Amino acid sequence: SFIKHSLSYDMPSEISYLVNTIIESTKELIKTINDFDIDTYINDLIISEYNKQKSQLILEEFKHEMINNFLPHMNDTPNQLKGFYIMSLLRKFIYCIYYTSRYPDRDSMVCHRVLTYGKYFEILAHDELENYIGNIRTDIINNHKNRGTYSVNIHVLTTPGFNHAFSGLLSGKFKKTDGSYRTHSHYSWMQNISIPRSVGYYPDQVKISKMFSVRKYHPSQYAYFCPSDVPERGPQVGLVSQLSVLTSITNICTNEYLELEKKICNYIRSYNHNDISYFETGYYITLENSLIACLNPNLVDDFVIDFRRKKRMNYFGNLEIGITLVNDHMNEIRINIGGGRLIRPFLVIDNGNLIMDEIFSELEFKIDDMTFSDIQKEFPHVIEIVDIEQFTFSNVCESVQKFRALPKSEKCKYHLCDFPAEFKDGYVASSLVGINHNSGPRAILGCAQRKQAISCLSSDIRNKIDNGIHLIYPERPIVISKALETSKIAVNCFGQHVTIALMSYKGINQEDGIIIKKQFVERGGLDIITAKKHQVEIPLENFNNKERVKSTAYSKLESNGLVRLNAFLESGDAIARNISSRTLEDDFVQDNQISFDISDRYTDMYQSRVERVQVDLTDKVKVRVLTMKERRPVLGDKFTSRTSQKGTVAYIADETELPYDENGIKPDVIINSTSIFSRKTVSMLIEVILTSAYEVSPYNNDGQNRPICFPSSNETSIDTYLDFAKRCHRDRYPSLSDDDINDKMFCDTILYDPETDKPYSSKIFMGPIYYLRLRHLTQDKATVRCRGKKTKLIRQANEGRRRGGGIKFGEMERDCLIAHGAANTITEVLKDSEEDYQDVYVCENCGDITAQIQGNKVCIRCSKQNLSTILTKVDTTHVAKVFITQMNARGVKVKLEFEKRNPLFYKPLDVVDLSPNFL
């Protein structure tokens, strides 16, 4: 009756029927066993498992291990509590059979812990330490049995696992099958922040399986993960996401964990013994899934409220504890203190009152001089740190504005209130503007482009020999958000303010093409500097070889064999001396030693200045050279706004070719106006309007600089921003009419044609905006060549720009030439220019390519059968011959056949009629 009442209490009626069925079937099972005894039954199960595992332990040791290690997370717990825990699991299992959607599924983040680098290192180190101690123990026992000595072999003392753990910690590369922080190369300052906050969920098996549901945005990720900064394509879609701005990951040491566990257990056991022993109809209290007590249902709400208050007051010495009240027939209080949990702060609602509103006057007076930790100490009940499980089972109001508008009866239903919507985005998404005013895909594309934006200079750019691209004259953005300001991303700038105009320019700026002003480029507009590392390893004998070689590549080297500082390297120049010498085995040659240059060359299309040279002398000479190059915008370079309005330079126009306004101001960049409508980026227009408003009123009433807050996600209407801009222009130009003020507010400007000096018939949208330059540079991607290196096997051009390869001329390009009838060009491109042609002899009997034996062409297949062969010479490419040979080696016969017809000189000549045709 106890089991029946415990499993069916506060459950739907259909579950009660199933519980009765389970109990009755168990009774019937017991009746079938003669003289049933529970101890004997369990003992038989252990013996059966012992025989199944073929354990090397004796039976008593195996039995002791099985019983003691049952439910290992409750190892020190009495067996009675273990039994109650099994009943709680059975209760949840039965409930989830009927109501599968009520409890977190496999893909819910409630069921996941993020494995950070430190935690992974700790797991590897613990496992290796256990193996290390176990190996030493086993070796001592074996040596004592065999030789009677207590010695340890030297190979047992090696620690390859520790070496693997430390190398993984330093390199950030553990096994790919575990979800953990991800690492990438850093191209900009933004990636230093965004990449460590990128979390992967699932192992590699998910990427190749047909599991599409796990790639969807799971509801449990709301408020803790950025919904915008996700991969838009590739195998990582839906499997990797960024933490939101306020989200962090818990971390706790073992000694802190044990101390905190002891404090919480003492607090729970401070309740009356009868109130925490309701194992039949009470609420189970678990601490990290370990059953502690079962609480009186009448005390549940008061217990949770009191526990949360004590937690906020730091009674337990830890503010990151998660306490979750699971109602809905589950009847469980879950307390979590472990590491790897996702946590973030929320505003506290107590009995229908927002605590922040009650102490607002006192908090507002001190807020300028307080940090987040100070608020938690002085006003502990304002903010609560909540983990993702507590958030899932709590009633959370999405904004303060919505909560204040609710009636009192509705307010009492909520436990927590969220911060403004911009803090649900990640750091990358928070650098965008007005995501909620644009179409959905713009946010995802904007995050991807924002990571590619070139940021400001590093502090040690000249001494750090590494690849990097840096903006020379960065500017702090005027339109920012709270997240952008507090994270210091705004201070570490990533773009410049430029004047743009939305118009068509002679049909040049079609699609993504933009027009950029030549004088803007010459004055350093969006100018960058490229730092590039060139590293070579040279054998010591080659580096010290003083033999002279006829090579113009050594013109920039000094006498020590290294490139000169401040030398300008061009394509083909050597980085360092590398001369290989070889002795010819020929007694008739007086000078039988030849030397040739095998040095690594500088391969970039543009000249670069040598900034630093480092040399490491070991068994090989390791030379590292840092080169610098100023890179002004050129045709094909890529730019974008913060609303994912990307564009490439289609034309660099002189200012005499550009239109101008009544003040003579000319746009720095001209963008295709139709891109706004096709991509639906309304927030780009709002950003221009707000930046223009800052231009006329950059200071507040106290005379201090006043950036404009236009966050990535917000609940403010567009009319509010337009009214703000209108007031700024009205204060600056009080005498203008409403129409003129509206023109200035909406950045509608009359531009004049530079050729006729007459105004255009319609007004042009022109104003300032924060513009970004991306790391996709034309000169870094040009791979056209007409001659160069070839591969040894197939004698075709190398693949890849770094290896001196060119653009592949493939099937589609060939089809274009066929359409033009350019037969000779096809022959030259596909056969003569880049490949080695080869004459081969083919046997007309079997179609095999002949072999050359002692200078004679022989068909091996026909010669073994003593057949007479007819060999035909075929002019083909070397790669075709290699392909046929490899197919034959794999057991695939490729037969070359010829058209059966007589040669042309055997054809009878046409009869020529010599009679005169005028008769």
From Swiss-Prot:
One of its GO terms (cellular component) is virion component. GO terms for biological process: DNA-templated transcription. Keywords: DNA-directed RNA polymerase, Metal-binding, Nucleotidyltransferase, Transcription, Transferase, Virion. It comes from Sheeppox virus (strain KS-1). Coiled coil: none annotated. The DNA-dependent RNA polymerase used for intermediate and late genes expression consists of eight subunits (147) kDa, (133) kDa, (35) kDa, (30) kDa, (22) kDa, (19) kDa, (18) kDa and (7) kDa totalling more than 500 kDa in mass. The same holoenzyme, with the addition of the transcription-specificity factor RAP94, is used for early gene expression. One of its GO terms (molecular function) is DNA binding. This is DNA-directed RNA polymerase 132 kDa polypeptide. It is found in: Virion. Part of the DNA-dependent RNA polymerase which catalyzes the transcription of viral DNA into RNA using the four ribonucleoside triphosphates as substrates. Responsible for the transcription of early, intermediate and late genes. DNA-dependent RNA polymerase associates with the early transcription factor (ETF), itself composed of D6 and A7, thereby allowing the early genes transcription. Late transcription, and probably also intermediate transcription, require newly synthesized RNA polymerase. Belongs to the RNA polymerase beta chain family. It comes from the Viruses.
